[in-house]
């Protein structure tokens, strides 16, 4: 029985990658398209003046984007994690692994995850567990990678679509609180592409969580991935569940939103999406599907070159926004229009204040 469970988990990991890559072949418009930064025609800064340094988990990181959680737990995904770790090392950005449950249940799969530390010994690496994982096992996940931080992914929509997924969730908050108290490294609670509302973020802040990843809709769709894995595809009505990355970021502009650190991910396409998310308060911006898609289609070297180009393009965008660093960028005025403005208005966000901030 154990062997069958292990094979099922490994197959699921490989299917997640294959279906995720397929999704990224045809992308919908960015959920940040209705956000427009108000720039300048007479910049105060030169490109060389721009400082892209950000602070996450109490540490300075030279660039405000990272490789988000995606994979691990099979022979095939070991190779992918190794390549992602090489990219993270060369570009000098943080990296998260996918859920480590497979390795916690089958020690022969540990190397499919800790390969990232072997290849990137000095980088910022994030471990990853579900709130289903007991504390002692979660501590093993951290130790497995010598991780700098721990992602706890919350994914009820994905679990419900997954035939073998969890059906009990009421203990999650208590478990997360235990992690906050007992983890030797910082905790970040992340969605998996369904987005967090400000109410969810407040619930987490109230138990001591200091960082969340809003992880909105618009990128890899795990409801669709799990539905595609089902023979009956019985959950096709749930494929649009959740709030987008743009909506989640706008929601955090509400006057009652908790004042905790947040990251943004989900459907990030390019440096323009990155700067918009940073301007809306994110401390860093994560990508998973697009990086794996680039890795699969173009290889490690081309993906590194693309991300290095993004750094230079991002500096140029900061010049246009008249911001020397992320702190200044977060005071840059921006216009929210279209459907996103309608949504923000219904959520009682002061869009006029955003448009005229200084």
UniProtKB/Swiss-Prot annotation:
Alphabetized Pfam families for the sequence: FMN_dh (PF01070)
EC number: 5.3.3.2
Subcellular location: Cytoplasm
Top-level taxon of the source organism: Bacteria
Binding site for Mg(2+): 159
Keywords associated with the record: Cytoplasm, Flavoprotein, FMN, Isomerase, Isoprene biosynthesis, Magnesium, Metal-binding, NADP
Keyword Transferase set for record: no
Entry binding sites for substrate: 12-13, 158
Gene Ontology cellular component terms for the protein in this record: cytoplasm
Cofactor: FMN; NADPH; Mg(2+)
Any one GO molecular function term: FMN binding
Signal peptide residue numbers: none
CDD domains associated with the record: IDI-2_FMN (cd02811)
Family annotation (InterPro entries): Aldolase_TIM, FMN-dep_DH, IPdP_isomerase
Reaction(s) catalysed by this chain's protein: isopentenyl diphosphate = dimethylallyl diphosphate
GO biological process: isoprenoid biosynthetic process
Function: Involved in the biosynthesis of isoprenoids. Catalyzes the 1,3-allylic rearrangement of the homoallylic substrate isopentenyl (IPP) to its allylic isomer, dimethylallyl diphosphate (DMAPP).
Subunit and interaction comment: Homooctamer. Dimer of tetramers.
Protein name per Swiss-Prot or TrEMBL: Isopentenyl-diphosphate delta-isomerase
Organism: Listeria monocytogenes serovar 1/2a (strain ATCC BAA-679 / EGD-e)
Organism classification: Bacteria, Bacillati, Bacillota, Bacilli, Bacillales
Protein's gene: fni
């Amino acid at each position: 029985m154990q062997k069958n469970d292990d094979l099922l988990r490994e197959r699921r990991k490989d299917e997640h990658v294959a279906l995720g890559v397929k999704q990224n072949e045809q992308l919908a418009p960015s959920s940040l398209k209705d956000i427009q930064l108000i720039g300048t025609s007479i910049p105060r800064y030169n490109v060389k003046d721009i400082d892209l340094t950000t602070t996450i988990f109490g540490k300075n990181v030279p660039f405000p984007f990272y490789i988000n959680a995606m994979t691990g737990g099979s022979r095939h995904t070991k190779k992918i994690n190794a390549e992602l770790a090489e990219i993270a090392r060369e570009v000098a950005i943080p990296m998260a692994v996918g859920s480590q449950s497979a390795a916690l249940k089958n020690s022969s799969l540990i190397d499919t995850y800790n390969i990232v530390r072997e290849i990137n010994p000095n980088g910022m690496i994030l471990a990853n567990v579900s709130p289903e994982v007991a504390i002692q096992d979660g501590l093993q996940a951290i130790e497995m990678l010598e991780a700098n931080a721990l992602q706890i992914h919350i994914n009820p929509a994905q679990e419900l679509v997954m035939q073998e997924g969890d059906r009990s969730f009421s203990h999650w908050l208590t478990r997360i609180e235990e992690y906050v108290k007992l983890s030797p490294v910082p905790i970040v609670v992340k969605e998996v592409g369904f987005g967090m509302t400000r109410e969810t973020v407040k619930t987490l802040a109230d138990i001591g969580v200091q960082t969340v990843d809003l992880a909105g809709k618009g990128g890899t769709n795990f409801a669709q991935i799990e539905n595609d894995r089902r023979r009956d595809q019985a959950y096709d009505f749930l494929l649009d569940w959740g709030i987008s990355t743009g909506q989640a970021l706008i929601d955090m502009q509400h006057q009652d939103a908790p004042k905790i650190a947040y990251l943004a991910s989900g459907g990030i396409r390019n440096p323009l999406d990155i700067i918009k998310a940073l301007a809306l308060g994110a401390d860093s911006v994560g990508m998973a599907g697009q990086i794996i898609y680039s890795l699969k289609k173009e290889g490690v070297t081309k993906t590194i070159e693309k991300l290095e180009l993004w750094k230079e393009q991002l500096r140029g965008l900061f010049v246009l926004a008249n911001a020397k660093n992320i702190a200044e960028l977060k005071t840059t005025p921006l216009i929210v229009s279209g459907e996103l403005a309608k949504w923000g208005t219904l959520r009682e966000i002061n869009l006029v204040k955003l448009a005229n901030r200084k």
